[in-house]
């Protein structure tokens, strides 16, 4: 599927600033609430959805539906994907400065981490 033209719906910094408001909120597997609990792909789906940008529900689907970009060419607002035993099992929003904001796990909830807290295996862009 070709990604929709999301030009003008949001800038990378708007995506990041919105996402950062939810740092400290809980991680809940399968969750869709930015305040009461969300998982990694639910987090990205809800953040982008706030700006009218539709993302699929799973990390693997989000990786395949956006415009694929080189991990070294990421800009704030791009999505980074991480391997989970041979498949894409985690997604985070690049926030700039070598960091990502993501719904990490039940221990840390929504948090900011170094891009390379794990090795990113793919990146995708949904805003232009």
Residue ranges of model-derived segments:
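Stable alpha-helical elements in mature extracytoplasmic
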Residues: 11-15, 19, 39-40, 47
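Aromatic- and glycine-rich peptidoglycan recognition patches
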Residues: 2-10, 17-18, 53, 64-69, ...
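Short loop/turn microsegments at loop-to-beta-strand junctions
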Residues: 39, 89-90
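Catalytic cysteine-centered active-site loop
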Residues: 25-76
């Amino acid at each position: 599927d070709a990604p929709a033209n999301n030009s003008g719906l949001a800038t990378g910094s708007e995506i990041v600033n919105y996402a950062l408001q939810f740092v400290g909120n809980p991680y809940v597997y399968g969750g869709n609430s930015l305040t009461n609990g969300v998982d990694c792909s639910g987090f990205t789906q809800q953040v982008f959805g706030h700006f009218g940008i539709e993302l699929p529900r799973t990390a693997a689907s989000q990786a395949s539906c956006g415009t694929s970009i080189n991990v070294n060419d990421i800009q704030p607002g791009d999505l980074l994907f991480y391997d989970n035993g041979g498949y894409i099992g985690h997604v985070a929003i690049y926030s700039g400065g070598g960091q990502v904001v993501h719904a990490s796990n039940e221990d840390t909830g929504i948090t900011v981490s170094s891009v390379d807290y794990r090795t990113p295996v793919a990146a995708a862009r949904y805003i232009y």
